[in-house]
Amino acid sequence: MSDVFELENEIELESDEVIMENENVEEIVDAPMPFSMTTNNGVERGKFRSLTLINWNGFFARTFDLDELVTTLSGGNGAGKSTTMAGFVTALIPDLTLLHFRNTTEAGSTGGSRDKGLHGKLRPGVCYAVLDTINSRHQRILVGVRLQQIAGRDKKVDLKTFSIQGVELSQNPTALFTETVGERQARVLNLNELKDKIENIGAQFKQYHSITDYHGMMFDLGIIPKRLRSASDRSKFYKLIEASLYGGISSAITRSLRDYLLPENLGVRKAFQDMESALRENRMTLEAIKVTQSDRNLFKHLITETTNYVASDYMRNANERRGNIEAALESRREWYKAKAEQNLSQHRLVDLSREAAELAENERTLEVDHQSAVDHLNLVLNALRHQEKITRYQEDIAELTERLEEQKIVVEDANDALEESQAQFEQTEIEIDAVRAQLADYQQALDAQQTRALQYQQAITALEKAKTLCGLADLSVKNVEDYHAEFEAHAESLTETVLELEHKMSISEAAKSQFDKAYQLVCKIAGEIPRSSAWESAKELLREYPSQKLQAQQTPQLRTKLHELEQRYAQQQSAVKLLNDFNQRANLSLQTAEELEDYHAEQEALIEDISARLSEQVENRSTLRQKRENLTALYDENARKAPAWLTAQAALERLEQQSGETFEHSQDVMNFMQSQLVKERELTMQRDQLEQKRLQLDEQISRLSQPDGSEDPRLNMLAERFGGVLLSELYDDVTIEDAPYFSALYGPARHAIVVRDLNAVREQLAQLEDCPDDLYLIEGDPTAFDDSVLSAQELELGVVVQVSDRELRYSRFPEIPLFGRAAREKRLEELQIERDEVAEQYAQIAFDVQKCQRLHEHFSQFVGLHLALAFQPNPEELMSEINRERNEIDRELNQFNNGEQQLRIQLDNAKEKLQLLNKLIPQLNVLTDEDLIDRIEECREQLDIAEQDEYFIRQYGVTLSQLEPIANSLQSDPENYDGLKNELTQAIERQKQVQQRVFALADVVQRKHHFGYEDAGQAKTSELNEKLRQRLEQMQAQRDMQREQVRQKQSQFAEYNRVLIQLQSSYDSKYQLLNELISEISDLGVRADDGAEERARIRRDELHQQLSTSRQRRSYVEKQLTLIESEADNLNRLIRKTERDYKTQRELVVAAKVSWCVVLRLSRNSDMEKRLNRRELAYLSADELRSMSDKALGALRTAVADNEYLRDSLRVSEDSRKPENKVRFFIAVYQHLRERIRQDIIKTDDPIDAIEQMEIELSRLTAELTGREKKLAISSESVANIMRKTIQREQNRIRMLNQGLQNISFGQVKSVRLVVNIRDTHAMLLDALSGQQDEYQDLFNDNCITFSEAMAKLYQRINPHIDMGQRTAQTIGEELLDYRNYLELEVEVFRGADGWLRAESGALSTGEAIGTGMSILLMVVQSWEEESRRIRGKDIVPCRLLFLDEAARLDGKSISTLFELCERLDMQLLIAAPENISPEKGTTYKLVRKIAGNQEHVHVVGLRGFGATE
């Protein structure tokens, strides 16, 4: 009979809490059978006891007890079967990225519902899914997940994983997660309340914050078969559960069977570990070196830049503070100095103002005198110009007078000639008229008689005319010639008389002109006087003329004499003025020459004395200045040496700190260096010994680390060649307790090779070339080998083996067994510990060696750079002493300068007095000349007389010289001149009358023959007419000639007369100008002599020079006054400025003192003052320090960009007004660096020492890297052998798995198996790796690529037809190092008449596919357990459970096969089946979903042991 139990639940909500009412609880008819545990090699397998769902949809608080084998959930559609399984899977794999609960109709889909099937299966509030398990250690563990819906459109669910341990087996899981609040009500506890409840009952509650930790706990406690380290492992596990849940052959699993069935590289990876791990360690070492370098560089960079940044600002502030103090003191000194200068300037202003007033008054006087001198000079110049004009005009007038006289004579001659020519012309005109009349009369006659008659008549007329003119009544033709001769003689006598009168007239005219000229000259000189007194006046003038002429000639000498006297007088006045000035300046009253000469001698002596004293002081000052320059040069030399000396001292101090020694002399440094060399040699020997020991241990570890336990790699090649397996590999799984027995059992043959046929191998032994000295071969089946081949007896300390009938071998149990992986691993652990100890000792000794080397290097650098300076005296102390000496010298120099200034003032005063005396002494004789003024007056009177005579001579000298030769003509006045002139006129008239009579008589004489025509005069008429005509023509020609002569003489007379008029006009104008000039020069009132201009100019220049000197002095004084006034303003401003600067500087000093005190307090309290007070920076300028600080600031901004705290601290420190923030930043950096120091490597808190130790550590790591590089010499052949061994072992394991699947049958499927094959491309790769082709060795000898990359490149070489895609060589190489990529796995089934064929869903029925898929999943789980056996506790066998939803597709036989499979493989199975399915075995739950009002719940009835028997 079966036991029946039923539990009904109703759910209702009260006050927002989920309440449970138990309406009907039926007691279980027969109590559940106790949960039994099956054993696995003596270890019981863990089991899932129950599944508890709290507040799921339809299940408020339901616990499903799970059967040991099969638990069936039976019910209709929507009853809750899938929900129950979803709760189980959620508790098993609580990963929302994987969970996707779809029904079988959406199998293979990737989308599904939006909430992936979980959100809709939960109710609002807190939900739980809990698995109750009991593991191989009989520990009860409750693992589960708290679920809660998250409000929102995305239908998200929040998961919290937890575990509970220590709960009694009798405790119901439902009671743990709910709290009863009434007889029929309960509420769900939240996670915190659950934690409190579990802790109250004494159990352990643990919540997990990652799925990896949750699964790690489940693996450690034996709940899941495999450690799920990553999301990929969880995905595989979920795919396996999903494939199990939905049934069938999962393509996701079959496509990647290698990943599920084959374990990760254990053999190959372990073999490859020797090289790849070494590479990895090398890379880690490189990374460590990089990290160390980065830390070291960071430390160096931060310390250097921070020190530069803060120390430069610290020293700049210190310099500025010192500079501000000095500036304040300097401002105060300038303030006091400006006040003293102001007082001195005020006194000087008063003195200069008084002098300026005196100079102004003197200048006004000099200006008046100078203007007078200028005016006098102008008058003299005007007078000289007038005198020059007078002289020129006098000369011109004299010349004009002579020319005028000459011109008058010429005009008179021309006039006489003109009158004579006119008279002749008129006579010729009369004769022409007479001839014309005769000719006219002749022409009137018609014939010759008439003409003769006319001629006769004309002759009579001419006779009558002659009678009339001559007054001769008796004149006739006969006596006409006599009368003509008489009258002609009378005419000649009259002509002689006229000529005589003309001669007398010319003589009279000459006498008269001389008299008139002399009279005019006398009147010109003496004025208008009677003609009678002219001779007396002329005689008086001529008598005085020689004395006046002589006096006039003496005028220049008198002028020169007067000029010399006036100069002497001017010198006398100048000397008087100099004497007065000298007395005034010297405050003396010296008057006599003796007194002046004595004082002159005193001043010369004084000047010599002062000059001697001054030269002595100059020499002393020069000596002091030379001494000061020497001190300055010495100071500069020490100032140049000071930074280097300070740097050397800092280096020496660091060396003393590093070495712990104190060095007083350079020889101490050299001795210490020698001792360090000795110590370094000793430590190097210890290091080499430890290195040798470490290498031996590494060799043993490497030999024991072989996966098959072979110590000789040649054995692997021989085993592969013979087709056998190493004996050590067969006993690889032997326990550590049995390891001594088996090691002694086989003795020397523990490294034998197990082969199937010794005879086949014996033939190959002769061909062996490279093999161990002793090679043991044992015949047997490697897949089923045991120790029955040997006859052995175990003793207390060893084993006796019957080798043959006549040979026994006794082998003692080894103290350190190495047979079997467990023994080797134990020995490896011991060797690893020993190696770690040796490595630690080696590292310490190597560190000490490096430390010695670094210390010696530092000492060498110190010797090379600083030894010459480090032990010299302190330059700063010398500089202080030099400063004191320089200050003393400066004080002495100031005293010398003051004394020298006073001496120079005395010397200048003495020289000025001496200069005045030198000017005054040569003029002493002038001062004593008392009658100088009288002589000047006398000379001036003589000069006035002489100048008057000179003026008279200059004015009338020419006139007197003209008068002197003709003065005698004045003695008699020519009074008969007019009578003679009348007589001459009368004689000329008579001459004209006589000549007319002569002409008339001559006409009658010429016509005398005409008288004969009285009777017959007609015959000669024509001849007479012709003669008349000829005569008329002659007379006309003569008239024309005379007319031309008259015209010429008229023009000549006009020209001469015009010249005369011009001369007269010029004479009159110049004479008038001369009179005007004489009047003007008389009005000027000055003497225009030759020296007048020179004297006037000299006087003017002297006054101008005096005025200029006075003006210059006054200008200088006024400039000095202006300068003093401006300087007074400047001094006032300077006083205010210096006072303000002093107060400002004092405020700065006071204000900076507060901040400086804070800086000092911070630096001293943090022990940073010594690092900040870098004295060598004190010798840099503020700009250089600021530039250093700015550069360091820029570098620090980059360095601390990733550190928020330091970045903020640096930003705050940039405020220049608060230098203490920079010190705080410095402290923060040091604190940060102290925190960054790796205490496991560096044993110091000081970052400076940390840098040193980092250097040492870096050298050690570099040496270690070099050593490890030598270990990377693994060959490609060994890798290929290990890979083949691993593949062979896995093939054997797959064959063992196939044995468990041989008897499985589902429908027509009678058997299932796995087929393992090696890929052709990878087989070629293995052949290439194990071959001896030199063409491939270049890849593995290249140090620039890793072994993985070399593998990838080799794979590409031998398979050029395969496209590698975008994958890198490293990725491909890593895949090639995984032996699973060399294998192809396929699932085959033996189905009916088809025989063995590939297992595919299309070739199998649904039930066959489900069964086949379940078989594959069981194989995977079994493989996982085997793979994880080493990393799992030896007393743990994990739970084994699979799912199957919708089991209706399986027939009863198939279900029975599943039950059998579960029983045979010790597996639990959870299936879901329709209502009509009732398995014979296991536990079955009937699920019915009921609805009551608006509430629904699932009614569950559990059946155990239900089934029918045939």
From Swiss-Prot:
Record has NAD as a keyword: no
InterPro entries: MukB (IPR012090), MukB/SMC (IPR050308), MukB_hinge (IPR032520), MukB_hinge_sf (IPR042501), MukB_N_dom (IPR007406), P-loop_NTPase (IPR027417)
Gene Ontology molecular function, alphabetical: ATP binding; DNA binding
Tree of life domain: Bacteria
Function statement: Plays a central role in chromosome condensation, segregation and cell cycle progression. Functions as a homodimer, which is essential for chromosome partition. Involved in negative DNA supercoiling in vivo, and by this means organize and compact chromosomes. May achieve or facilitate chromosome segregation by condensation DNA from both sides of a centrally located replisome during cell division.
HAMAP family per record: MukB
Name of this chain's protein: Chromosome partition protein MukB
Lineage: Bacteria, Pseudomonadati, Pseudomonadota, Gammaproteobacteria, Pasteurellales
